[in-house]
Amino acid sequence: MSVYNPNDADFAFTLGIEEEYQIVDPETRELRSYITQILEPGRTILREQIKPEMHQSIVEVGTRPCRTISEARAEIVRLRSAIAGLAARHNLRIVAAGTHPFSSWMQQEITPDERYHMVVGEMQDAALQLLIFGMHCHIGMPNNEVAIELMNVARYICPHLLALSTSSPFWMGRNTGFKSYRSVIFSTFPRTGIPPTFHSASEFERYVQLLVNTGCIDNGKKIWWDLRPHPFFGTLEFRVCDIATKVEECLALAATMQALIVKFYTMFEENTTFRVYRRALINENKWRAQRWGLDGKLIDFGKRKEVEAKALVHEIVELVDDVVDMLGSRREVEYLLKIVENGTSADRQLRVFAETNDLKAVVDNLMVETMEGVPAMAFEADVQSQAAHS
């Protein structure tokens, strides 16, 4: 069983987290196109862990590969603190939410990079309006065949994870009626959504090669499914989630993804696994998740009936109960139950707006929640540590 123990050398199921933050002016609460000014000093401190995105009002960070959720916690706290500190040098703040409540994509500057301008040239307004912010979680894989087997099974759980992560109810100053409007916006891109199934890694590789040969893509990174085998990292990458506003929400989601993959792998090894469902059926649940979040019902296709999304979260926690202690993530996984009780970021944003009728108040609350659990002095300590080792 050493393959399941994070403390053993052959543990395969590492995790890494990527987050995309908004750069916000605390006076106007609007997005600010300022990544260029943040990037240079940021790379001095964070090196390859900070990246630009297509819009200059977005900054992306990524953790190092972590064996445990405790390691990931330290990384996320450090990264949020560092980016917040870099932004504060320019009197700016960061926000973790899937969309900005009112800033317009038509007023955002594009990062001066040939790659991004090529994307805009090809995708036009679909690219320009991609002012959205997600959380991606990479789970290490023993090999490519296992990655495909686990992707086929884990597709089913993507709508549940989306419902738990919703943080984008507003778009262009309007309540969209969706808990995750980010996922609606992203659906305008090709090769997005729930992935199809593949019988083997070689079948998947032939699919990618066909797209390359026919000029659709230049490599597998332009396959943007909600769950994909990463073409370079050797991971299975969950891409379905809105960015989590609170650190605890981020860690709960990441820990759950790792635990689910380990659970599915144990079932795979024991020759017992979940039924693999059609993409068309899973898409029904995804639409419900992005529309209603945890307040809606998802379809249990095994039982052929609707079930409250909140009840299904309890089932997820029960499903992974026998692996979380080994992974050291019981506290983080059980935080899902607090999300069920208190609501997601989208729910809180809607409550603030209902109380204030002011989208700026929504941004104010997001700025506070983004830094919840991040020590105020962590950034300066990190700067000093990096300087001492540079």
Swiss-Prot record:
Organism listed in the record: Chloroflexus aurantiacus (strain ATCC 29366 / DSM 635 / J-10-fl)
PANTHER family linked to this entry: GLUTAMATE--CYSTEINE LIGASE 2-RELATED
Keyword Nucleotide-binding: yes
UniProt keywords, alphabetically: ATP-binding, Ligase, Nucleotide-binding
Enzyme superclass (EC): ligase
EC number, UniProt record: 6.3.2.2
GO biological process: modified amino acid biosynthetic process
GO molecular function list: ATP binding; glutamate-cysteine ligase activity; ligase activity, forming carbon-nitrogen bonds
Name the record gives this protein: Putative glutamate--cysteine ligase 2
Annotated InterPro entries: GCL_type2/YbdK_subfam, GCS2, Gln_synth/guanido_kin_cat_dom, YbdK
